């Protein structure tokens, strides 16, 4: 009886907190345990967004660097991104925060049920970020960018996309297999079908949990969003929803800097004998081999020093991508791969390329139905701009707005992308009929 009274009290607090705009502390973890819900909260905290920009440890996780690049419009009439005036990652992030310096967010880390690469049941983790006060407008389902250390997993930090919470949106951000509670497993990097399934399973777990908590959004359509690895993944999530007629209404998809053609992206490392982001070479290879259960011996393709340190540098989840790049110590692809790994005609590489092709969203027999905003910097030094041009050619009949231009390197492009999405969301608030201002 006492337990039921506590649950009723919690629900009352949630209802008043989510809909009346009052700042009330609610123990979501206690509620999730009491109700035996689909999403079990393991940690909860409230974060002041302005404090983030003054936190050097948080900033350094996103590779804060200076650059002299300035946004320029591309040729061919493609619209430029909404411009942030700063030319540094830290500066653009500050501009993101300046929209609402007093904003606060409630972070809920938790676990949910999904499946692994063998289709066996597994518990995965992720984070939900809610406005600390006021109603929730819509959900934004985020597919995160490439990470390497477990401390970068969304359940363990405040993800960069989480800054959008200040506009009144609730963000759902899965960790993926290999991070969070499954950090002991190899991450099936860029294996699209399973990752899209894992992302959607978190959405299906979180929605009924928040409904029980009285925190349903004002609108029942959602946004999808992702940059880099997340850009390709969010398109795979859109495909999963539309191809299988899942009961999710997509308002718009925001995709930035994505490797939509995985084989082409990887092959550029081989063709140019240069990898500006060297950790991507072993991470992509391992993701394809493990995630697709290929019968390949990676030691025949990876240079011995890379293969021998793979578990320590990559699979331990101790190091960030920047730290792994420093440990690798070279950007010359032939120093990362064996002659067999550099030989596109070898049996091993042919099988690897086949898996990459099958996981490339551009090889799917599908055209996006929901509106898409696609962003890519022509200066991207990690994911070649050609990916975006191939997407534009493949999906020429789709409802896609393109934003291509000189927006800086891959990292700066990420922050500009989020800045642009924020501007589009603000426009969307004013134009609920679906017409977006650029």
Question: Residue spans of the language-model regions?
Answer:
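Short beta-strand/loop motif that positions the catalytic acidic residue
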Residues: 368, 373-380
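Primarily recognizes the serine-hydrolase "nucleophile elbow" in alpha/beta-hydrolase
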Residues: 204-276
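Accessory cap/linker subdomain of secreted extracellular hydrolases
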Residues: 60, 256-364
């Amino acid at each position: 009886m006492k337990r039921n009274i506590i649950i009723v009290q919690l629900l009352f607090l949630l209802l008043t907190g989510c809909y009346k705009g009052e700042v009330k502390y609610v123990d979501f973890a206690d509620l999730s345990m009491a109700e035996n819900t689909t999403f079990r909260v393991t940690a909860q905290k409230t974060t002041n967004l302005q404090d983030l920009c003054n936190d050097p440890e948080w900033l350094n996780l996103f590779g804060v660097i200076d650059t002299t690049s300035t946004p320029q419009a591309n040729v061919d009439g493609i619209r430029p991104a909404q411009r942030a005036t700063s030319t540094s990652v830290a500066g653009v992030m500050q501009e993101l925060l300046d929209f609402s310096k007093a904003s606060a967010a409630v972070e809920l880390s938790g676990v949910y049920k999904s499946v692994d690469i063998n289709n066996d049941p597994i518990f995965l983790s992720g984070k939900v970020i809610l406005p600390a006060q006021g109603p929730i407008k819509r959900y934004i389902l985020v597919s995160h960018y490439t990470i390497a250390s477990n401390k970068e997993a969304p359940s363990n930090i405040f993800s960069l996309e989480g800054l959008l919470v200040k506009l009144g949106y609730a963000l759902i951000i899965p960790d993926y297999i290999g991070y969070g509670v499954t950090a002991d497993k190899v991450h099936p990097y860029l294996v699209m079908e399973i990752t899209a399934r894992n992302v959607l399973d978190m959405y299906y777990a979180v929605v009924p949990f928040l409904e029980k908590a009285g925190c349903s959004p004002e609108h029942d359509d959602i946004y999808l969003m992702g940059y880099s690895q997340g850009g390709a993944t969010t398109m795979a999530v859109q495909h999963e929803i539309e191809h299988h007629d899942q009961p999710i209404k997509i308002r718009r998809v925001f995709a930035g800097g994505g490797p939509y053609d995985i084989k082409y992206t990887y092959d550029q490392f081989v063709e140019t004998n240069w990898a500006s982001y060297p950790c991507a070479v072993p991470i992509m290879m391992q993701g394809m081999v493990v995630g697709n259960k290929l019968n390949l011996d990676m030691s025949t393709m990876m240079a011995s020093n890379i293969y021998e340190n793979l578990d320590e540098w990559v699979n331990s989840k101790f190091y960030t991508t920047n730290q792994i790049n420093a440990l690798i110590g070279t950007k010359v692809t032939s120093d990362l791969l064996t002659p067999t790994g550099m030989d596109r005609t070898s049996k091993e590489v042919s099988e690897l390329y086949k898996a990459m092709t099958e996981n490339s969203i551009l090889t799917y027999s599908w055209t996006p139905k929901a509106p898409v905003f696609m962003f890519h910097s022509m200066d991207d030094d990690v994911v070649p701009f050609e990916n975006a041009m191939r997407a534009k050619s493949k999906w020429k009949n789709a409802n896609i707005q393109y934003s291509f231009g000189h927006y800086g390197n891959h990292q700066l492009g990420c922050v500009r992308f989020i800045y642009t999405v924020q501007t589009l969301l603000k426009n969307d608030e004013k134009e609920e009929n679906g017409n977006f201002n650029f």
